[in-house]
Amino acid sequence: MADEVGLFYLMMKKREEEESYIRRRNLTVLRNKKDPFSYEENTFRKFFRFPKSLCWDLINQLKPYDKQQTSIPFELRFISVLYFLCNGSYQCCVGNAYFAVMSQPTISRCIEYICKLVVERKHGEVRFPNSVEEYNRIKTGFYSKFGIKGVIGAIDCTHVGIIAPALSNTVVQHDYMNRKGYYSINVEAVCDDELIFRHVNAKFPGSCHDSGIWTTSPARIKLIRKHSDGALKWLLGDSGYPLEPWLFTPVANPETPNEQNFNTRHIRARNTIERAFGVLKSRFRSISRERTLRYKHSKAAIFIYTCTIFHNILEKRGIFLNETEILPDRSPPENVETISEIHSGEYYTRGRAARQRCINTLNN
């Protein structure tokens, strides 16, 4: 009897080993057969937003820095992360995609690792201008398109939905509840006239007001330093921001034709950031209003930074979305019922004088 039991267990073990081998072989065959780079170019772009050649360039640039301990090829991990960011799928759906075939824990590790690698190696794709020539190029771009001198960017915030954060000693859940009643990160960003992000700050929860985020913003600190050196450059923001020498808001209750003209041009120029958000979220549906990132703040922020890096790479290379593909940004607006001006002491006084000098230079 004991011999029969022993034989039975040996047979079961052998069968399990054979089935395990068949599964591994099938996965290998499936991965080889379903190479996403074999797709037609238009199909590839539909799924991954990048042209194949540019995708290969990124893979070749990042692969030498890959230290993740896994047998899954870097190319497959990278393309799976792109698929997740572009389509906003659940991890299990990404893992079951016919080109991936990975377990949910595996795809989870891949997404976090690859996004961190992209931010670490490619963070320079999102940066403030660092030369006089670059500033002048942006100023010229805004002036030629919208007729306002000295503008180096448009600023606003957008909300990216996340799941309810777990309670802890450092996390207060209601801090993440925004004005529309869902949990989010309030992401501050600055873009130039070509919709390229020059600054992104994803550190603040959804309940934070845009002007509160601006108070400690690295972009603000940089501009304060620039103005102390006598530089004439400013951002354009809506009336939810304070009027400062380096941040122009619309004129409250415009009385003269020049002031009305300024407000009209201001609206058109500032709309570049709204459009940039729309393009970003249309490319990367994982951070769109229709999706919710099921991650804690720190991980979700890494995904947001990765998406803005990829967005800039595409924009700089002239790879644009069609107008019909761009969705409007549906972030909850700030609680500003009428145009008013937020006073901030000396900065407000200096900002009002600087804005008036700018208004006086407008050509009708």
Residue ranges of predicted features:
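Short, polybasic Lys/Arg-rich linear motifs in disordered N-terminal/cytosolic regions
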Residues: M1-N364
